[in-house]
Amino acid sequence: MTEQAYAAIAAACDRLLRAPGTTLGRVAIPLLHVINEHPSCLAQYAPLLPSSSVTRSRPSPFTLLNSARVAARAGRAVTRLFRPPESLTRARALGQVDVLIISHLVSLSLLDTPDDFYFGALQSSLRERGVTSALVLLNHLHGEDARRAYTMRSFPATRMILPRTVLPRVEAQIWRQCAAARGYLRQAAHDAHDTVDQAVAKLASDHALSAGTAENLRLHACISDVCHLLNPRIIITTHEGDASERMIWHAARSTGRRPLCVGYQHARLFARAHAIRRSLGVPGIDCDPDVILTQGEIPHAALAASPGLGSIRLIAYGSHRRAEPMTLPALDERPRSCLVLPDGDDGECSILFEFALACARRAPEIAFALRPHPSVNLTALRSRHNALRQLPDNVTLSVSGTLDQECARARYCLYRGSSAVIQAVLAGIKPFYVARAGELPFDSLFALPYWRETLMSPEDFVTRVSATDASPDQDAARRAWAFCDRYVSRVRPAAIDELLDMVGAPVREPAQ
């Protein structure tokens, strides 16, 4: 995809979202929220590109007429009509809370940890201030793990897993909303004069019947139920700009008290990040955040320079994942080891691991540690990638120990879109971005003008690593460290007090 095509598609999606008569069903369509240039985000727009040769008459994999996938989806929907929703017993037992945190369950092992994977010790910090809170987890697990999560009872009473089913009448209403959104968008495609607007509206009409759209509307219904029971003053969730976040904030404002809606910019901010940089301003559908918490000085400045955010307030918060400073050996005193850091996308994991294995075959004197994202299921990962079952002698799969420990042992790292590379640079590691021909770059360190290098082939890696070892640029490494030190800050407790002050919540001073 070209820069021009990306910008045109993003603008067309925004026009559809802001058009008069936009419904909640339209806002729920994931396709209409252009997040960023990551390949996993761009894949859904492939039919809009010339090489796809998509025409009006071509059947889409998302339409009711393309029976195989949709028939299966319809069957699951019918089954869901007769399945009772999972219980909200914990919410009923809690009663009213001051702060509702919406986070994500990406691994069963994270359910019993004292701190949340995305928000760290936020609940503890609130409790120290005498502020009540509840942590609601969106269940992103699959198969047996997804079912087991609802039967586990060992986690704290102030945590709960959001139901993924709704009452039969609500399920039926959801699919009516999807069908209505499809009809409106097909009409918009028919009426459009611009070819991009026409193509985007047509594709969006197909996606109106996708599982993702229905899941977002189901999420809206479940969050409405939770907010009705807990009546929070503040609701906080992660924020990258996708449709599910809009569902959460709109649902929270639809019941009882109007809470302060907060988004936490927890992930890396790509050069072309779109949806997080603007408010939607959908007529009659209040789904923008009131506040965005930022994870560091650099992303804070980038969002502050985004005129599309309008009156949304930015508050510097930081990240619990920011590692404490450690005394580390100099780069030339470490073993010749390369840390491989994919993000949580399976396709990206495959690309980066295959590239690393190719490098390992060309440089047997260098050790490679393949470190999957914490959300990745290792059993499933091995089953999908045969190459991981029998690794070369100089390659290991890093599944134990912390990222800090791995960083302390490495000289170099391979990465693409992972924010873990920031932690690697803070540990003094030389970062190498793996690019591919024909794609928009999505380098997490795009704004870093020194120290990082771009690779197109394993041969590039061998050449660049040899040059780095022969003449390490310590000054560039120090400047890169300073950059990353500003990208992710330590948690700023005063940010919590600012939020509580905005809603007039009574607070006691936390113990020192």
Regions found by a protein language model. Give the residues of each.
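Catalytic-core helical/loop segments in enzymes performing group transfer/polymerization on anionic/lipid-linked
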Residues: 1-512
